[in-house]
């Protein structure tokens, strides 16, 4: 069908929902719990479905204060939290029940909409568990708004971080962002200046023992640029980009070639695997890194993330 700038082509699949426009194609999976494919101008941007994130690689200070042991539940939650409910809304009208096969048979190949939202509700593996909701809202121009809500729960340890992780198929050539200069953390903001910055490649701070690094606080926008894909038939090395921008408030982000788990597993830099992916982490909350000493002193109280408090953040994806 012919695409226009004011309509989405909606494809009701057996176990997924497709949204198409003139130069984009998004696939939302009911089984995998989120956005499974994000194609813009024939370039795929996702290697894995984005997932809620509760862990950042621990630091020497974390180990010294025992924080990594106290909050170990969040390490498992980062890996194993499951999506247990999905809500679909098309042009502000709820679609119930969820149109999986054979319920999708009533739809044609010519369904259109101006706005589609999918809310994925995740249950953490913590004891007690809590709920995280990730809501994707797509408009006809291809912009994706992502709103993430963490429901505060008493009797849980403090969080290392809370955010959403995007793993991209190939390594980025670099990224540009508007925010604070250099690496910054909630307790490491002094001396940073606000501006627009470019970072080549995906640098990892060369600590003797790999640990948390590369955070950028108070970010208004970050644009990731790649020049390669996993498509062996794609010989075009022209750079292409995707932008993540704030909505109501700035966010924090890191853009690395490794996940927090990969950094956590390595005890020396040479144990890290070859860089093959881009791991963009968008954070709504980040624990401080401390530094008073590395043999027992905790991060100062204002830089903790209490588990009993709600956390909300949102951002847009556009091209």
UniProtKB/Swiss-Prot annotation:
Enumerate the GO terms in the molecular function aspect: beta-galactosidase activity; carbohydrate binding
User: What superkingdom heads the lineage?
Assistant: Bacteria
| Catalyzed reaction equations | Hydrolysis of terminal non-reducing beta-D-galactose residues in beta-D-galactosides
What does the subunit section of this Swiss-Prot or TrEMBL entry state?
Heterodimer of a large (LacL) and a small subunit (LacM).
Q: By what name is this protein known?
A: Beta-galactosidase small subunit
> Which family, according to the similarity comment?
Belongs to the bacterial beta-galactosidase small subunit family.
Q: What does this protein do?
A: Component of a beta-galactosidase that displays activity with the artificial chromogenic substrate o-nitrophenyl-beta-D-galactopyranoside (ONPG).
Q: Which GO terms describe its biological process?
A: lactose catabolic process
Q: What Gene Ontology cellular component terms go with this record?
A: beta-galactosidase complex
